[in-house]
Amino acid sequence: NRMPKLNVEQNVNKNAIFPEEKAESVFFKRKFIKTAIKKIEAMENKGIFISRQDALLDGIRINASNILWTGGVETWKKLAAKGYWINGTSDSLGKNNEPPCTLFDDLDWLNFTHDRNQEKSSMEKFISYELTPKEDEIKIKDKQYFYWMSGSAFQYALELYPNIIEANHACGLGASYDIIDRQISGKVVPFLNYEDWKHQITADTDE
């Protein structure tokens, strides 16, 4: 399958893109589920897959028999800064490039995720945090170019404004791409990151 390319008109007005700044893209409050701590600390011989740092609170004692694997390098860095030893990463290549389960076939793999995750996965889900929509108004209905930081943000925005499905959509090379591409197959364009997308889409405009 050939990757779709971004259909960029020259001189895209910054008022037509979302988000203009990264902070605008946060639609949810993320809250760790405290009752998960004892369950996590009791885990042994598990492969733990984490795609967001929110899935693991600071200071949880992870048994040494477990393997910790992240969805990307950024999550690795953030969890390492919290003091966790990370065994490897899928380097933002998404769930299609899941942890190398065949290398650790004696482990049961768990995907630490949030309560709104409806995605099918070869891994069992372990719900470790909740997503609560923020009360701020999301001003996106007149936007034409979108970069999505997460699949759940795209799905939530689509519920609020179904017409945005006709716009130009982009996201990173991770699980978000898999989720969004399933909904608008062949119409979402992957980028290395938000900055890469913003640079390309506004390259011909006056700063």
Task: Identify the function of each model-found stretch.
Residues N1-E207:
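Signature of uroporphyrinogen-III synthase
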